[in-house]
Amino acid sequence: MSRKIDTSKQFLEFYVKKGLYLVELSENHFKNKEYKKCLELLSQAHGMFEKGGVKDEAEKVKARFNDIKKNFFKSTKT
């Protein structure tokens, strides 16, 4: 009879670490004025934090995403 191993805690830790890495990487792209790539990475980080269950970090990333989008991209609405 095989026993199942509970790896859910490890997955949550992985999601948080991956989210932190993506935020750090996005900051490098931001400094290099690669705003589109920065937004892509922040979007991915937001998803990782959501999966990892750290809603406060996800909200911080979302706020940063919206701030960059508002300040560095022009609205296409006419």
Language-model features, listed with the residues they occupy:
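Alpha-helical linker/edge segments of TPR/alpha-solenoid repeat scaffolds
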Residues: I5, A63-T78
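Start-of-helix signal in alpha-solenoid helical-repeat scaffolds, especially tetratricopeptide repeats
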Residues: I5, L12, K17-L20, C38-L39, ...
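Structural signature of alpha-solenoid helical repeat scaffolds
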Residues: D6, F11-E13, K33, G53
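Hydrophobic/aromatic side-chain positions at a characteristic register within alpha-helices
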Residues: F11, V23, F30, K37, ...
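Structural register within alpha-helical repeat arrays
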Residues: K18, L25, N32, Q44-A45, ...
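Short, charge-rich amphipathic alpha-helical segments embedded
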Residues: L39-K70
